Swiss-Prot record:
Catalytic activity of the protein: (2R)-2-phosphoglycerate = (2R)-3-phosphoglycerate
Binding residues annotated for Mn(2+) 2, in chain numbering: 12, 62, 444-445
Co-factor note (free text): Binds 2 manganese ions per subunit.
Protein name (record): 2,3-bisphosphoglycerate-independent phosphoglycerate mutase
CDD domains: iPGM
Lineage, uppermost ranks: Bacteria, Bacillati, Bacillota, Bacilli, Bacillales
Primary gene name: gpmI
Amino acid sequence: MSKKPVALIILDGFALRDEDKGNAVTHAKKPNFDRFWNEYPHATLQASGEAVGLPEGQMGNSEVGHLNIGAGRIVYQSLTRVNVAIREGEFEQNETLLAAVKHAKEKGTNLHLFGLLSDGGVHSHIEHLYALLRLAKSEGLEKVYIHGFLDGRDVAPQSAETYLKELNEKIEEYGVGEIATLSGRYYSMDRDKRWERVEKSYRAMVYGEGPSYTSAEECVKDSYENGIYDEFVLPSVITKEDGSPVATIQDEDAVIFYNFRPDRAIQISNTFANEDFRSFDRGEKHPKNLHFVCLTHFSETVDGYVAFKPNNLDNTLGEVLSQNNLKQLRIAETEKYPHVTFFMSGGREAEFPGETRILIDSPKVATYDLKPEMSAYEVTDALLAEIEGDKQDAILLNFANPDMVGHSGMLEPTVKAIETVDECLGKIVDAILAKGGTAIITADHGNADEVITLEGNPMTAHTTNPVPVIVTKQGLELREDGILGDLAPTMLTLLDVAQPKEMTGKTLIK
């Protein structure tokens, strides 16, 4: 029996932008894309910022794009997830955070907050520290101590004074919190098993060992005078007037580690949280019965509580297709194969029942501007054979060219990449239409739409421009305010499959 396949075709890195200069999408001759755009219902989708779970104004990327597409909902990345929780009042009601505060109150012990002291947004955000201070204040906690890790890597190398000034203003405003130690991230956030670095941080925080200063500002000033900048500031102790440490971490204390990115948070967390820690001798005073909270899930190896548990993405597009006994194909060349498989399945490696995967090798060249067609023709031939063989109900396809060649920042090769993809697109969509099927033509983020800046410089990064969506079925009308998370519900509508409640995206078909 002839199948009427529904295909989701992702032109990776292909967005729409009015400005013609440096725009490979407008420069390319793409008769097939233009034909489908003119003949069929079309619209644009937001593929960056909060529409895909990133901070406002941040460009999208392939991983995030495919996660959102496959999930059929906005998948909040950790930074945005915590930001949204703060904005909507959920942060101060977080049971895990409240339990840490309650522990310190009931035991009459201290609450320690530690993490990277910047707004870099890569490992942490200082606003999350401020939210914790507000939470502690609202719960009536007085003994709250901050162990600041200085950045200088995701932000300017000598920016610590700015963040300390702002932090001290917040401490003054809220009437809670005191800085107890400072340490460059080189020590406290090592991830390469350089335990001697982590130990220096640990001993400052637990034993009050290390250079001592009467204020955080004095510590930074002294380091700068010695040519040591933020990232490399030696773990240092802030002292009271009598020379004793402001605070050390002791038995029964509570700790909240407010970094959200795991890789550089694991080792120092192991040091405090794990009873069976053996990487260095923690000494006699190692704090017992700590109530240790990680902001997000750092690792199975960390024996702590988790405030924002991982989002398990249930009922992704692939899972729903499988539950409905529909045959699905994932096809791409090497560069984007993980995206149409692992990321589109919500971070799942295994295939679903009824899922077939075709991987076409990407060409072995130093950079793809040397071969802008990449393996698009081979991908197309393999897919046409599948369509002819009536094997698939649903097809998930990625063309890597506009993104991978766009990263070269070179106009002519990127134009060639798009013209190649357009040729392939025509063959594939015509084959699907000949079977009575439907194609959804779209993209995951921008790139090829700006490969040269208005000043004439190469532009190798992604863009925040909207991406196209075309549905090759007459008589439909599409919404104009769509996001990537609306693509899976649209595909399910075309397949006449019920949308699960976990998919909070909405079909684009009016």
